[in-house]
């Protein structure tokens, strides 16, 4: 039903844009074919970068629940883990806007990624220590706040840059493709957990997990986020649109007069 719901929403959603004669592709007014949108976006490197950032951001792993049950020995902690994940985000997001405005989307996100890496590696201090585990989660979530806050704004900048560069404004496709990459990443993450646990010899029917399985859980919890931090940092290195946003916005405004 969920895939059908997404398709129904997509099929019955129509974007309405005010256009003047001469707007569109090569001066053609009216509706722009979907193919022209994708052709324009394919040449927009910032679109590809934000897709990669969305994918990497959401390739987090759900290994925390396994660690709570099999490493910390308390499956009742799963609900508390959820709170430790959500509360920092709720508290921190209102502060992310001024931070991003002050230092820029890329720089604020880069700084946050350092915290994500530190928070992940913190688990190695003592993987079986409850407080170390929760501090790790909280530090990671605080670190990811700037990126979470910046990505939607980055997508908006990608739309503006695309219109400035090619004359094609693709709001709907840019934002929906970001959402799609997020969902694909979450699916890949879930599948990866199953593959890793299977390779480590995980057996849900056993009361005690093997040392190899426990090690796989801990290492996945730590190294998958660290690897994604490296990927996101590399993508952000090439994301220099922050420096061009004002110029792009100004020229677009002049064209629309």
Please report, for each region that a protein language model flagged, where it lies by residue:
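Residue-level signature of mid-helix packing/kink "hotspots" within the transmembrane helices
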Residues: 86-94, 187
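A late C-terminal transmembrane helix in Major Facilitator Superfamily
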Residues: 166-201
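Helix-to-loop junctions at the C-terminal end of transmembrane segments
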Residues: 91-105
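Loop-to-transmembrane helix entry
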Residues: 64, 70-88, 210-220
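A membrane-interface helix-boundary motif in multi-pass transporters
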Residues: 195-227
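Helix-loop junctions at membrane interfaces in 12-TM secondary transporters
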Residues: 124-137, 147
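Intracellular loop-helix junctions on the cytosolic face of multi-pass helical membrane proteins
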Residues: 1-65, 69-74, 220, 225-257
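Structural signature of the two symmetry-related core transmembrane helices
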Residues: 107-122
């Amino acid at each position: 039903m969920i895939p059908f719901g997404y398709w129904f929403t997509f099929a019955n959603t129509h974007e309405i844009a005010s256009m003047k004669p001469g707007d569109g592709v090569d001066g053609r007014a009216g509706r722009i074919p979907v193919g022209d949108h994708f052709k324009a976006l394919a040449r927009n490197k910032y679109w590809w970068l934000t897709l990669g950032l969305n994918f990497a951001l959401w390739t987090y792993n759900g290994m925390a629940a396994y660690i709570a049950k099999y490493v910390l020995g308390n499956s009742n902690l799963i609900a508390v883990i959820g709170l430790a994940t959500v509360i920092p985000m709720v508290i921190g997001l209102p502060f992310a806007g001024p931070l991003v405005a002050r230092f820029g989307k890329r720089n604020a996100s880069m700084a946050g990624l350092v915290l994500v890496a530190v928070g992940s590696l913190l688990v190695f201090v003592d993987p079986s220590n409850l407080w170390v585990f929760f501090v790790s989660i909280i530090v990671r979530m605080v670190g990811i706040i700037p990126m979470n806050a910046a990505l939607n704004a980055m997508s908006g900048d990608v739309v503006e840059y695309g219109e400035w560069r090619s004359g094609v404004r693709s709001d709907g496709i840019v934002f929906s493709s970001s959402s799609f990459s997020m969902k694909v990443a979450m699916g890949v993450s879930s599948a990866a957990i199953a593959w890793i646990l299977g390779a480590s010899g995980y057996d849900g029917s056993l009361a005690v997990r093997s040392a190899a399985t426990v090690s796989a859980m801990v290492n996945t919890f730590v190294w998958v986020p660290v690897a994604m931090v490296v990927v996101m940092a590399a993508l952000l290195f090439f994301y220099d649109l922050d420096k061009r946003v004002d110029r792009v916005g100004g020229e677009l405004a002049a064209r629309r007069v």
